[in-house]
Amino acid sequence: DEELRRLHARLGVYSCTGNHEYRYEAEQKIQWLNRAGISMLRDSAVLIDSAFYVVGREDVVFPERVPLSEILNRQNVNRFKPVIVLNHSPNDLDEEVNAGADIALYGHTHHGQAFPGNIATRLVFEVAYGYARKGDTHIYVTSGLGLAGPQYRIGTVSEVAVLNVKFEK
């Protein structure tokens, strides 16, 4: 809690849910993150500084997950402004591409976490780690900080990805 409260950004700190929130006590975890100053975006969009949108997706394990195009329409997202989508699992990049997202950010894969998992994730996900561009959408999948299952990494690294974003007219 204390460490998360140290996260600060001039325009706010935003996140989306992932599969681990839904393993148990999801609502308590989400409330805890909100109390720590992290705005959890749950199939919702927020206009930042009247300049761009951040859209947070519910994880694919959430049964009432809403299609991205519906979120954008329901929240009257101005498609002439840049749209950044936070989506935990990179299992359907076409949804963000087809919805016209400018940037789509993902996690989930842990970059395989331990060899040979990093090879396996490349077989499962179109983009398992790093940067790619698909259509007009810039995609980044981070290996993240956390671990799933075994508490080690082999052949991959934990990371905090720092992206410098500049939108041109």
Language model region names:
Residues D1-K169:
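Soluble catalytic domains of enzymes that build or remodel membrane lipids, polysaccharides, and related
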